[in-house]
Amino acid sequence: MALNDETKVVVLLLPFPVQGHLNPFLQLSHLIAAQNIAVHYVGTVTHIRQAKLRYHNATSNIHFHAFEVPPYVSPPPNPEDDFPSHLIPSFEASAHLREPVGKLLQSLSSQAKRVVLINDSLMASVAQDAANFSNVERYCFQVFSALNTAGDFWEQMGKPPLADFHFPDIPSLQGCISAQFTDFLTAQNEFRKFNNGDIYNTSRVIEGPYVELLERFNGGKEVWALGPFTPLAVEKKDSIGFSHPCMEWLDKQEPSSVIYVSFGTTTALRDEQIQELATGLEQSKQKFIWVLRDADKGDIFDGSEAKRYELPEGFEERVEGMGLVVRDWAPQMEILSHSSTGGFMSHCGWNSCLESLTRGVPMATWAMHSDQPRNAVLVTDVLKVGLIVKDWEQRKSLVSASVIENAVRRLMETKEGDEIRKRAVKLKDEIHRSMDEGGVSRMEMASFIAHISR
């Protein structure tokens, strides 16, 4: 984009190359661009294409910069891995964005009063050359929950007693990620000291105490809780009038009668776990939509065929009318927004948690890796808007069909489930009010926009 002398502020966003990071960065881009601020979004050719493909809103007011990186292997997901290590080659390839990002910063900084670089916390090393430009301010976007990040800081400090604060019992980070990724995180943390402040996709309504704790931990730097970024209203049909078949199926179901089952874009389940899950859903006798697709590869466009999971013989025929199996990309926000959806069995990725919380849908938690076990604690123990399917302490074990059946029934047809659902709806209403005119989230976003536009 050609800039002119009147240009005051330009914002450059630099996401980490996985779906759970690409999308919230696009959502934030959309919100900033709506304030008549020039927004640039940077990534590899592959991941810019992926981000656009899976984003719901128009992106015409966002300037994309797709840079080539050296070829990298894109192995299939390995369901035996506790962590999605198959994605690490794409992470390493993205390190080559440092040079083109530096050149783009040089170009933008020469034409604007101020360049605001918002980099993913996992792209801190790529963003390091921002320090070379006097009119570039750098902010770190944490796409994780405030509880998760505060837990990281607290753990690094040796878990000292905190005045007037009690942490829930959360898993150690070491058990949630691989040793290789731990080294990667350590390398990124070396560059966090150059930040002007931190941004979180959360709300003080959802995580107020943990946002305040982060402010205590942040050495005087600003902390903004700008979320949730997920849109509160979504259309059943896309821009050309297409409606996913599962939405038509939902239209025929009773209110709050369907449990939605999806484990995100980085989880690959073992074949025997798929069999148990299918049996558990069938035996629960509850209506369900089950998204059954393999985890993303580092390059989702490499042309290789994704694994097709085998279900028990005759399963889809037996559950016809009761359940729907979706083997492609599903419109998750639309499903969660539908009045027939009454529960969400989830891996507890933070984006999925926020989408569920903003729609008042209670969760059945089944954490897999990374921040997910801590998010599950937030949902079940802190907010009390969900129940546990798989306990993190039993993460190496197969979850039996009977355990799955029991969890689904508890959420969907018991008094306990009804109480959880009432709390979820109450929290949804509080979140929505916070995003209305005068609400705490709306005011925090206005504060951030005023700060970078000053």
Swiss-Prot record:
The keyword ATP-binding does not apply. Pfam families: UDPGT. GO terms for molecular function: zeatin O-beta-D-xylosyltransferase activity. Its EC number is 2.4.2.40. High level in young seeds, less in older seeds and very low in roots. GO terms for biological process: cytokinin metabolic process; protein glycosylation. The keyword Transferase applies. It comes from the Eukaryota. It catalyses: zeatin + UDP-alpha-D-xylose = O-beta-D-xylosylzeatin + UDP + H(+). Keywords: Glycosyltransferase, Transferase. Belongs to the UDP-glycosyltransferase family. Utilizes UDP-xylose as the sugar donor and catalyzes the formation of o-xylosylzeatin from zeatin. Does not act on UDP-glucose. This is Zeatin O-xylosyltransferase. The gene is ZOX1.
